[in-house]
């Protein structure tokens, strides 16, 4: 029980940067754990694909209306180890610079606002440009 309490205490005292990184890594590890359990049980990736599909951002504006949480939850999804590795490295380096010059409190808002802006741009680009 003290292990869980230690984690809660560390998370409570962590900066916004480390909390964001911890959330991203925890979501990734949970999905990888489910994928590993399904593989060892002889199943396929159906459950993980369903979870990722439920948490990801749909490309259709109509589907976004029925899955609005995807605008926020997609920011924390990563497909493989290289994806999360490079995203966390970039978040760490830029996050340290950001918090040094603008403060710790503004990082959460900037992260979420940047993610929402990216979601809007993704949905617009997917539906406006024929390359997709």
Residue ranges and their predicted role:
Residues 13-132:
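N-terminal TM1-TM2 helical hairpin plus the immediately adjacent luminal interfacial "cap"
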